[in-house]
Amino acid sequence: MLILETVPLLRREVRRWRQEGKRIALVPTMGNLHDGHMALVNEAHARADVVIVSVFVNPMQFDRPDDLARYPRTLQEDCEQLNRHGVDLVFAPAAEEIYPQGVSQQTYVDVPALSSILEGASRPGHFRGVATIVSKLFNLVQPDLACFGEKDYQQLQLIRKLVADMGYGTEIVGVPIVRGEDGLALSSRNGYLDSDERRLAPRLYNIMMQLASQLENGERDLEALLEQTASRLRQAGFCPDELFIRDADTLGDVNVDTRTAIVLMAAWLGQARLIDNVRIAFNADA
């Protein structure tokens, strides 16, 4: 497995594989890898000849400097895990390699329709940072496909729109959420939980599924349902951050044409901001 830190070396290897007619998959990550990331790698292996994983804690997508500073950096362990999973190349650049003139001087990419709604409304600049780094990686690697987790659902939809709008020839593959046996979605930020919080954390999933069940049973007073769910979260020890019921395809409000809805949740538990989502049939009989 190759571990590269510079753009010229990355391009050299990509050029070689292209000349050999290889199909290339990219898995962008910020490191601190877990089984959810390995599911992305496995999906990439199933669809391509060569798997490239980027490990880059992207400063442009952090809206809080303290969050950026404390984000776990575990490159050695990440590379060992990726090597065991047969990854061909790890691209682990420094911030100066990606943003040589600094973040403030970097040309950026924005997807206005999806960057400022939902999670983007409370995290200004976050999705601009995501769109910019993904665009740069796509330009460097020109992958045939790229794998992203469905846990970050708004991010996944934003990247799909980015690819469609900009004419990238990259297939975007969404990979289902990987959960622990207790239902908690795997996340690098789960490491912020202490032992008591970790025991409590699966309640987020349980409460989300309770809301999903109410929707599937035909309850349609969405405002009341969201208030009930927020109350359940608070009673369980969470601090609700974001809670939405949206059309799964457009991320707009559900309406008579919605066939699949999605519940999007974010809540704080101690120092960890936990996110989750579930899609449900909506207006199935319409």
Swiss-Prot record:
One term under GO cellular component: cytosol
Gene3D superfamilies per record: HUPs (3.40.50.620), Pantoate-beta-alanine ligase, C-terminal domain (3.30.1300.10)
Subcellular location: Cytoplasm
EC number of this enzyme: 6.3.2.1
InterPro entries the record matches: Pantoate_ligase, Pantoate_ligase_C, Rossmann-like_a/b/a_fold
Cytoplasm in keyword set: yes
Active-site residues, as the UniProt record annotates them: H37
First-tier enzyme category under EC: ligase
Residues where ATP binds: 30-37, 149-152, 178, 186-189
Pathway listed: Cofactor biosynthesis; (R)-pantothenate biosynthesis; (R)-pantothenate from (R)-pantoate and beta-alanine: step 1/1
Pfam families from the UniProt entry: Pantoate_ligase
Binding site for (R)-pantoate: Q61, Q155
Positions with a binding annotation for beta-alanine: Q61
Catalyses which reaction(s): (R)-pantoate + beta-alanine + ATP = (R)-pantothenate + AMP + diphosphate + H(+)
Coiled-coil stretches: none
GO molecular function per UniProt: ATP binding; pantoate-beta-alanine ligase activity
Keyword entries, A-Z: ATP-binding, Cytoplasm, Ligase, Nucleotide-binding, Pantothenate biosynthesis
A Gene Ontology biological process term: pantothenate biosynthetic process
Quaternary state and interactors: Homodimer.
Function of the molecule: Catalyzes the condensation of pantoate with beta-alanine in an ATP-dependent reaction via a pantoyl-adenylate intermediate.
Note: The reaction proceeds by a bi uni uni bi ping pong mechanism.
Annotated family: Belongs to the pantothenate synthetase family.
Full protein name: Pantothenate synthetase
